[in-house]
Amino acid sequence: MKSNAICAIATAKGSSALGVIRISGDNLDSLLSHIFTKKLSDRRAVLTDIIANNIIYDNCIVILYSSPKSYTGEDVIEIITHGNPVIMHSIIELLCKNGVSNAAPGEFTERAFLNNKISLEKAEAVSDLISASDIQAVRAAQNSLNGKFYDEVNEVLSCIVSLRAQLESIINFPEDDDTPDLTAKKITEQVERITSLLENILINSKEGRTLNHKRTYAFIGKPNSGKSSIINCLLREDASIVTNIAGTTRDSIEYELSINNKIVTIVDTAGIRATQDKVEVEGIERSIKAVLKADKIFYVVDVSIGLDKDDHAILKNYNITNYDIVFNKIDLEGLESRVIQKSPTEIYLSAINNIGIDLIRDKVDEDFIQVEKVEDLYLARSRHVDHLIDAKECINRCPSHISDCKYDILAEDMRNAHVALSSILGQNPTEELLNEIFTSFCIGK
């Protein structure tokens, strides 16, 4: 178990009204009492100065959560400061001079796991909740954090353990009168229940996994088609340079955008055309890489030119399939009436007049999974789905073992399914797995 005291800023970077510094370790009150002008009281907010060498660092609210009733299971102190990064970093430096170390990413939650305050899949749910890209993903992560995923996996485990115990009894003590009366029919009924529970978890896990994917949309097309102008309208700011000179955008630029409470990444790319300009060629190559990574493409066309042979060549040569055609500059052709047309793969708009831009937002919104009963979902990770599939493959082999009366092989498949599901909950995890999970967290969590 780790016991050295650690600290980190728990709020986002930058200036804000308030900032939070989190500390965890053993005997924090005695370790740090000399830097507070007032005595800390367990689970009570104390208004106190932080002071050292007659220098007041800040007037703060400090809360002590004594072990074991804390997030990490150790003593935890949370310092609420004014949200100036200079103030917060100066307090971190003071703490480090007084026996506290800087926390690694995810180290607070890792300590919570190691101290049996939280299961591994709940620890992962903490990270998923922080990084959730829309409200449905938030709710699904909350379901996992509140134990829905754990409870359902644990229910299957309980059924497997029960059946394993019965099978082992028959295998090891066949002549014992106390062995359970386990017929093929009874075994089949239990296996069918396990299969049904697993299938339900797997369906919800796969759907929940899609919720946690932040979608990427790339805007591509020939130079001067208006890609950057459209993106500026979406962002409601002049984030991309816009001129009448073809080839202004020389690189792929990513932006984060909230559309109907869904966080997406949009990519502005260099215009694709034949050119000898080495810088522009590099930008075009990066545009193609953005296309390969994007979930969907908006192919932007100057409506006054139309979709010509060069556009068709670009779409074909770069194997662009999942795309919508965006006809821009309709104001130049008097085609404003086309905006109201509902085409599944075509959008007509005028970026310069901000007409039809909402059609882009609508298209993005349509791509997101619409879950009517998000309360049934949880944010499962790839490793969870892999373990569920492994367990289900073991269970799927059971009916043939039952019909052949191969109870020893049946028991072994049950054991392997047990191991797979236990891995989801973090029973006997490897150090490599823990490092992979917790290093993906932000500092301070």
For the regions a language model picked out, list residue spans one by one.
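A glycine-rich (often HGG/GG-containing) alpha/beta subdomain
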Residues: 1-139, 143, 147
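C-terminal-of-GTPase-core extension/linker across diverse P-loop GTPases
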Residues: 2-9, 13, 135-258, 275-277, ...
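Short glycine-/polar-rich loops that comprise or flank the Walker A/P-loop
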Residues: 16, 43-46, 293-297, 320-323, ...
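Switch I (G2) and immediately adjacent beta-strands of P-loop GTPase domains
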Residues: 47-66, 247-275, 293
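Glycine-rich, N-terminal phosphate-binding loop of Rossmann-like dinucleotide-binding domains
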Residues: 81-83, 234, 269, 294, ...
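Generic enzyme active-site microenvironment
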Residues: 266, 300, 326
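Inter-motif core of Ras-like GTPase G domains
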Residues: 280-304
